[in-house]
From Swiss-Prot:
One of its GO terms (cellular component) is plasma membrane. It comes from the Bacteria. This is Uncharacterized protein MG306. Its main location: membrane. It is found in: Cell membrane. The chain crosses the membrane at residues 15-35, 56-76, 86-106, 131-151, 176-196, 253-273, 289-309, 349-369.
Amino acid sequence: MAKLTTNTFFNTKNIVAFSFFLVFLIVISVIVTIFFLGVSVDDVKTIITAINYQNWGWIFVVILGFLVSVLWNVIINWWVSRRFCFYASWWEWLLFGFVVQFFQIVTPLSLGQDPFRLYWFIKKGMKKQTAVLIVTSTGAFWNLSQALITWPSFFVLSKNYQLLANNHNSFVSYWLSLTGMIFDVVVAILFIVIAFNKKMHVLIYSLVNQFRKWLKRPYLTKEQIYQRFIEKAEFNKLYGIEMRRWGLTIFKLLANMVVAIVSYFSLFGVFMITKTVNTTNNVIDQYSLIDLFNITNIAVTASNFIPVASGEGATQFVMTSFLNAFKPTDQFLHDQIKDGVFLWRLLSVYLPAIFTGICFVVWIVQVIWEFKKTVNVPLKTVNTVSLETKKDK
């Protein structure tokens, strides 16, 4: 029997930090929209009224990237956790997927999603070591998949380097993109190295231990840390078993690539929505589907290393710079690019942030209700895999 007396996730420090990130995202989004893209309230009305209603179906294509990402958050975590006899109802998984997406959107570098996943699994009764195993064994694949699909786009873009070099904004955007892609590769490598390196485990847990000691929480001695991570090395063995499940590992990589590709094709859908009939000077007349995919792919990656929620500002800067650099643009095309990029962010970031934010509030209400409903409840324990008996199926 375990007594649930406090909800450590909702302490003052976490609430203040989260509120800061949310307010910061809103402020940056407004500043970028008004001062960089030059979109006013009247412009928003104009954008909405200018939508070609014959192409409303393309809105679903834009939103599809968001829905696929949410569905993937649910599928991969459910798929991996079921091996550890973990159970949650379908609606809890669905709510989990939306809240993970919320943290991806509103926290810098999407750093909030993994702590939330850890908290959610542990709160549902999973052992800490098992929860860490699930989170780390799925975390590296997004960065790795981005690297695999972005480098080819970057090489195609580099063929027109001289055009980019002639324009200051596009020249800066080019090098931002290269930095973002290198960042993806480094993060993916760090995930794998940290997971397998015993000394890194000792170092990281020693830092955590010092923090727990400072908070006057239970902590391990140096000998206990050494025994757990060097002599027994249980986590390394379990992580190795998990990563050697080649079918699942390849599935994680390919599925992450599909999620990214679907998302990056969404810009084409936006310009299909905003195209003007009876003219050949639309963005989609000047740029092919593959062109827009490459530009979106690189623009998103360029903001990966910038510690602002959803790469706000950097993504729009790179995208508009490239779109204006490769083709001669008149005022009509320039305005369509500006309006299209804003609409793309509205449908892929701002509205999803509002919707998933509501889901986050629903989840908070659920947690508070559960704590008030039960004072003493038996906590289920989800055991880790037995090294001797569990085989990859």
